[in-house]
């Protein structure tokens, strides 16, 4: 089975941001995506409205950038679409926010979007699909050829805990504290074609594996492979999907810059004849769990002998190493914002702080998330 790969500029960038529609009175999710998207099409036309689309549940809208040359361009693109949606949503008494999970809303009360693909997913996966009331950020970075795609996917697995720790924003599930930094990552990993990618050596290996999945009836299309990192042949990108939903535009820009810099450096290394390393899968699996459980306080395994290091320190050193790349790509400020996240705390920390100050009232958590979406920056109260 041949899967054409669309060549893409190595610095091109695209971002997908899954937003929650929240009732401003009850602070619970409200399923009104269809109405809002219909009004958006009427207001700006089909072309511009294509930057916002349905997801599995009617209480979610995904915002999508075009193909961008820089992080600054991508975040500006997102901001423009979010602004349009916010105006339409607020007329209905709905606010926009983002986090890996809603702190309290129950998945059993959510309406599924009327789409054959979603109905088929729920029919096949049943409870696993019905509880997918989770929200993420996906970052696409351009890759010049299919030959580079799988080596870059494999090498990026080493950074799964870094992205997850920075973005972790789902400590609550159905109104209770899970004890995790990212419960979303554990909910999503329950799907049989989600989680860590298989370390396939090259593009023919990827094509062969996809053919096996389709012939066996495991999937209908390769779009149904929801790995934490995957190649996207149609876009000519590598797509990082591991991140929890990020509440503020600043944080979205930070993880996008980190992704763009890493992929760009790997592109260059391949061009220079360097063979990218593929980390051992058991090590990545364990480090992903540690990031999901402990977030920025995780101690990740850094070698096959069991040596460990604080993920905070690894992120700090990684950012320093990538600053020359970021300077060339024009995203030094956004990359440095990853260090701001280390100082202020990732969203799971801020959410727990907000709940603690409110005596456990999770509506205060929702209010904080709504504010962060509106201001574009993390809210840190003393």
Swiss-Prot record:
SUPFAM superfamilies per the UniProt record, alphabetical: Glutamine synthetase/guanido kinase
One MF annotation (Gene Ontology) recorded for this entry: ATP binding
Any Pfam family matching the protein: GCS2
Organism of this sequence: Frankia casuarinae (strain DSM 45818 / CECT 9043 / HFP020203 / CcI3)
Highest rank taxon of the organism: Bacteria
Key word Nucleotide-binding present: yes
Function of the protein: ATP-dependent carboxylate-amine ligase which exhibits weak glutamate--cysteine ligase activity.
Stated family: Belongs to the glutamate--cysteine ligase type 2 family. YbdK subfamily.
Name of the protein described by the UniProt record: Putative glutamate--cysteine ligase 2-1
Enzyme class: ligase
EC number: 6.3.2.2
């Amino acid at each position: 089975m041949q899967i054409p790969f669309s060549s893409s500029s190595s610095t091109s960038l695209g971002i997908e941001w899954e937003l929650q529609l929240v009732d401003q009175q009850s602070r619970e999710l409200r399923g009104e995506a269809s109405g809002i998207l219909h009004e958006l099409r009427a207001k700006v036309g089909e072309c511009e409205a294509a930057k916002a689309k349905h997801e599995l549940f009617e209480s979610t809208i995904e915002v999508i950038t075009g193909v961008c040359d820089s992080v600054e361009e991508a975040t500006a693109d997102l901001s423009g679409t979010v602004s349009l949606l916010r105006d339409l949503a607020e007329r209905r008494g709905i606010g926009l926010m983002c986090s890996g999970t809603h702190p309290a809303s129950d998945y059993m009360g959510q309406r599924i979007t009327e789409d054959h693909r979603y109905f088929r997913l729920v029919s096949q996966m049943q409870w696993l699909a019905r509880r997918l009331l989770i929200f993420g950020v996906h970052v696409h970075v351009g890759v010049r050829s299919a030959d580079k795609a799988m080596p870059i996917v494999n090498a990026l697995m080493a950074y799964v805990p870094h992205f997850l720790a920075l973005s972790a924003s789902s400590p609550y599930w159905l109104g209770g504290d899970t004890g995790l930094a990212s419960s979303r990552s554990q909910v999503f990993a329950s799907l049989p074609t989600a989680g860590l990618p298989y370390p396939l050596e090259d593009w023919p290996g990827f094509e062969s594996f996809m053919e096996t999945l389709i012939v066996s009836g495991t999937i209908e299309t390769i779009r149904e492979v929801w790995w934490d990192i995957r190649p996207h042949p149609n876009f000519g990108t590598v797509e990082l999907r591991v991140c929890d939903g990020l509440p503020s535009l600043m944080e979205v820009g930070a993880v996008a810059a980190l992704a763009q810099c890493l992929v760009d450096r790997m592109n260059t290394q391949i061009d220079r004849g360097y063979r990218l390393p593929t980390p051992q899968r058991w090590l990545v699996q364990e480090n992903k769990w540690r990031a999901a459980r402990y977030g920025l306080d995780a101690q990740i395994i850094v070698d096959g002998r069991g040596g460990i290091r604080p993920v905070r320190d690894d992120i700090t050193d990684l950012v320093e190493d990538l600053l020359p790349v970021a300077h060339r790509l024009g995203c030094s400020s956004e990359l440095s914002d990853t260090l701001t996240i280390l100082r202020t705390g990732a969203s799971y920390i801020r959410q727990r702080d907000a709940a603690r100050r409110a005596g456990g009232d999770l509506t205060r958590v929702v209010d904080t998330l709504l504010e962060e979406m509106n201001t574009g920056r993390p809210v840190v109260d003393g």
